[in-house]
Amino acid sequence: MFRYMLAACMALMPFLPSGAQATEVSEFTLDNGLHAVVIEDHRAPVVVHMLWYRVGAADEPPGRSGIAHFLEHLMFKATETLESGEFSDTVEANGGSDNAFTSWDYTGYYQRVASDRLGLMMQMEADRMRNLLLTDEDITTERSVILEERAQRTDSSAGALFNEQMRASLYLAHPYRIPIGGWRHEIESLGREDVFSFYHDYYSPDNAILIVAGDVTPEEVRALAEEHYGPLEPSGVEPRERPHDPPQIADRRVYYEDPRVSDPYVVRSYIAPERDPGNQRTAAALTLLSNVLAGSGATAVLPRVLQVEEARSLYAAASYSGTNLDDTVFSVFNVPVPGVSLEEAEADLDRVIAQFLEDGIDPEQFARIQFQWEAEMIYAQDDVGDWARMYGVGLTSGLTVQDIQDWPDVIASITPEEVMEAARMIFTETTSVTGYLTAPGL
């Protein structure tokens, strides 16, 4: 199996950037505090322009959940120089595409265009950073849009509602407990003054990270950034201060019934450490732990035992994402076959994890997982948008450019012993929430 993975990885190599293209990453900071990162890739005359703000759903004022996502939508309205909707129309007219996104730690905006259109993208992005105009009609219309978006993505999904309740139970005080899109009753009360206050507090060059990836040079990017972003005044935004959870001393349980559920499942989530600047080994060990437990199909611990050997599970998995500003989540899941209760499915998870903690990691499986992870990292480098996104997420989560560049080497250096140490640290019920999602009568 290992040699086939090696052959597959080698087959990818002709399609990868050359070493110079893949590793030419530079950074600079303008006098107004704008941090810029340039990723050179000269294979095609295309550029990805991203502007990331160090503000997200976890930075919203109490009682105003959803405002970060709301503002993301409103940023496509009129400015002092553009009509409502003209931003995206201009990108499209120049043969490009654009979008935006919100998470707990960041809000981001991006455009993919021909490299000779980069200056125009900066001009428009700098304009809406400080010159957004909003009418009461804009607020009313877009609030209806995001409420409908919540209805479609969350309220109509039993799994999404269940996940909201799980996070709200897992985090006791930290704002990661609040949905990215906000609670419906708080979205309904958001007004124009709320939005403008948030906009003026956080949308400024000293709270932004510019990522440009593609057919550009650092000198070109700096000249354009100085021209378009340089004149903007900084706001003096303070470093983020968030409430943190007290010590967690008891496990919690969530039981949610919904008639729309067809496949009941049990999930247990644990508070877990994130990647820290200069200290990523624990997060790397947890990344590999999630892969050992569930990341390599039928050979991973949970699916191998529960799905293949015992046929007691339709699906068993683990998940972990360490790129957060604050403590993150490690989860294990089990969707039992019909006839196996959720109580039994939970016991199955506990049993398999306990056996794993006793037996340790199979060395051959661990070598395969590390190699597969490295191959996936190499493959991801083939798209400049993925590169830009990786740096944007990392930097807005508190990492440095060096941390992001070091990550593959950190992963490659992790030992099985470190993974087992991370497993023993994480699998303590005092920091966990166990949830059952089921339907009435099941």
Spans of model-derived segments:
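Scaffold signal of the M16-like zinc-metallopeptidase fold and its non-catalytic homologs
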Residues: 78, 121, 153-204, 225, ...
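An aromatic/glycine/proline-enriched structural segment found at the starts
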Residues: 172, 180, 205, 209-276, ...
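A structural supersecondary motif
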Residues: 267-271, 294-336
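M16/MPP (pitrilysin/insulinase) zinc-metallopeptidase core fold and M16-derived inactive scaffolds
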Residues: 25, 49-112, 177-180, 296-312, ...
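M16/insulysin-pitrilysin zinc metalloprotease superfamily fold
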Residues: 78-81, 112-143, 296, 322-380
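Bacterial N-terminal signal peptides
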Residues: 5-17
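Mature N-terminal segment immediately following signal peptide/propeptide cleavage
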Residues: 22-52
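C-terminal regions of mature proteins
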Residues: 209-211, 333-335, 356, 360, ...
